[in-house]
Amino acid sequence: MYKILLITCFSIMAFAGFAQKEPPETLDEYKKEYNERIKKDNLAGIYIPKDLNDAFVELNKKIADKDKDKFKSLSEDEAAHKLFFSLGRWIVVNWGFDGGSRLSHSFKGLGLFHPEDMSTFIIRAYHRKLNNKDLAMSELIKTIVTARKTTRAADLKDAPVLHEEVRKIPKKKSK
C-alpha cells in the first residue's frame, strides 16, 4: 500500500512538472506569445472582453445588484481606491493584462500601458457608467497616465544611486 501511494505521488509530481509551460526566455518568444494571446477571446478558460463596453457587460454579469448599488453609492475616488486590490487585481490577473490579452492590447492603443492603470481605468469608467455620467475617456486616461508619471518621478527622485560609472574617453593621439 505504501509503495502504491509513493508511486502515485511521484507520478502526479512528474506530470505536474511537465504540465507547466515555461515563460518565454527571449524577446522574440515573448512577442510571439503576446501576438497569439491578443487574438484569443478566451485565456485559461476565462472569457476576455474585446473592449471597454464588453468589459462592462462582463462586470454586469459577475457583480450582484446589491454590490453594484454599494459601488455606485461611493465616490469615484473612493470606489477606485477600495476596489484596487480586489476587483482591480482580479481584472489584471483574470483578463490577462500582464501577459497581454485582446483587452489590454486595445487599452495600449488608447495610451494605457501599465496593467494597474488599465484596471483603474475600468473601475473608474464602470463607476461612471453605473452612475450615468459621461465617461470622458480621454480625460480619464490623461489623468491616470499623469498620475503614473508623477508617482514614478517622485519614486526616482528619492531613490539612491546604487552605482555610478564614469566613462573615460581615451585621448586622441596627435599626428
Label each region the model flagged.
Residues L27-F97:
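N-terminal Sec/ER secretory leader and immediately downstream segment
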Residues K66-K70, L74-K168:
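Compact alpha-helical subdomains of small soluble proteins
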Residues M1-P24:
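Bacterial Sec-dependent N-terminal signal peptides
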Residues G17-V57, E139-K175:
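Sec-dependent signal peptide cleavage junction
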